[in-house]
Amino acid sequence: MTKYIFVTGGVVSSIGKGIVAASLGRLLKNRGLKVTIQKFDPYINIDPGTMSPYQHGEVYVTDDGAETDLDLGHYERFIDINLNKYSNVTTGKIYSEVLRKERKGEYLGATVQVIPHITDALKEKIKRAASTTDSDVIITEVGGTVGDIESLPFLEALRQMKADVGSENVMYIHTTLLPYLKAAGEMKTKPTQHSVKELRGLGIQPNMLVIRTEEPVEQGIKNKLAQFCDVNSEAVIESRDVEHLYQIPLNLQAQSMDQIVCDHLKLNAPQADMTEWSAMVDKVMNLRKTTKIALVGKYVELPDAYLSVVEALKHSGYANDTAIDLKWVNANDVTVDNAADLLGDADGIIVPGGFGQRGTEGKIQAIRYARENDVPMLGICLGMQLTCVEFARHVLNMEGANSFELEPSTKYPIIDIMRDQIDIEDMGGTLRLGLYPCKLKPGSKAAMAYNNQEVVQRRHRHRYEFNNKFRSEFEAAGFVFSGVSPDNRLVEIVELKEKKFFVAAQYHPELQSRPNRPEELYTAFVTAAIKNSN
């Protein structure tokens, strides 16, 4: 029988529910249990695919092509699993599916209501996420905070699950903030008490509290919360601020969180062996070197827009015993005249993805600086496309060369729309999304980075591609197409072989990086940057 764990939040948003859920998932996985995890987002968008990065941060893409919340990146990195489209559910997605069924007459003339139709659809998503992965345990995080009007159908669905599958198969975990008032010199429990009262008013009694705090929590405070919130005192778990996120699973294990969960759900599983994880954390805490990487992006005011890129750089740094000193460079600020001033102190330069024209000329100048000064450079998605544009302009002398996306009237459309995208008008969910194979060119830097594999599978999110009409001219000038689709139609990786490391990929390698298993192309880039700093 599948066990269901529901993680809710109270008092404030962005309290760390996702990290708590991911950390618990890691502990349960290391007990030998098969775990999956999902995120409920109460916003009305179908998915975050068309949302501004300033609103939502990065869009995380799964193997099967779902555009999802960035928390799924935390889930995959912590638990080291590959999630699917059932792992992210929004209000918009549920309502659109229910309304589509209503239009088809599938409700047989019934009045379609929040209860039971919306809540049934939500419960079906929970069960589908578990069944498609054959999991022993599914952890479901509900975005937002208890009391938000848009969360009510989600919480009602969670309440109903207890009756549907039995109380012994369901556990409710509530995360809250425990503020410390310096003036009073004490922690205040009232916000948590009221949050739990609100949750109980909706019919959900939490079985565990996870309290986010900056200071250590005395046992007396835990006992008080246990008494007023009707949970066992040992089930009041402290989640204190830490230097590195990957410490959190160890901190939760030290408080027997996973054992309490197993006892409640009657899961007979051995103790979690966190030896490898602990060794990784110890290494992270004691890195001996520092490498400066300049990230040239258009959304640098919000680092979450590049969360997976940053984490992938860190992971590759761990493998090289180096901390990553990230220098955020706004692409709008980079010109041919100041590129050396902005980028001259960087050991390596990364140019990540993005959409739209703003900042693209600055990215092109950053790529030009890296090429002309032989600074290790990694381009991702749009960064790969602009690498091709830069080479066309400044090496092949194709004046005005550009991407058709950015300048439809260009004489040299180096990057063009994919053939199967020409007639598509909708923006959401219509890109080339998900896992696709990439055939590597033997002897190339890309092939060496991937240990001379013939083919790798990586996740994509794009609508435009390199225009093959120009391929022969590029190759004649020494531009190497080191990764292509198996049918040789789509360019996946480009590079300049004579440079220390000048490689750009159409796909998003960062989405498959893990703290204890870094992505190979990122690792090759960081390794080259370290050598460049010596």
From Swiss-Prot:
Annotated metabolic or biological route of this protein: Pyrimidine metabolism; CTP biosynthesis via de novo pathway; CTP from UDP: step 2/2
Any one Gene Ontology cellular component term annotated for this protein: cytosol
Activity regulation statement: Allosterically activated by GTP, when glutamine is the substrate; GTP has no effect on the reaction when ammonia is the substrate. The allosteric effector GTP functions by stabilizing the protein conformation that binds the tetrahedral intermediate(s) formed during glutamine hydrolysis. Inhibited by the product CTP, via allosteric rather than competitive inhibition.
Coiled coil: none
Top-level EC class as recorded in UniProt: ligase
Signal sequence, renumbered to the chain: none
Active site positions: 381 (nucleophile), 508, 510
Annotated binding of Mg(2+), by residue: 71, 141
Residues where UTP binds: 13, 188-193, 224
Gene Ontology process terms (BP): 'de novo' CTP biosynthetic process; pyrimidine nucleobase biosynthetic process
Assembly and oligomerization: Homotetramer.
Other remarks in the entry: CTPSs have evolved a hybrid strategy for distinguishing between UTP and CTP. The overlapping regions of the product feedback inhibitory and substrate sites recognize a common feature in both compounds, the triphosphate moiety. To differentiate isosteric substrate and product pyrimidine rings, an additional pocket far from the expected kinase/ligase catalytic site, specifically recognizes the cytosine and ribose portions of the product inhibitor.
Family statement: Belongs to the CTP synthase family.
Name of this chain's protein: CTP synthase
Organism from which the protein derives: Streptococcus pyogenes serotype M4 (strain MGAS10750)
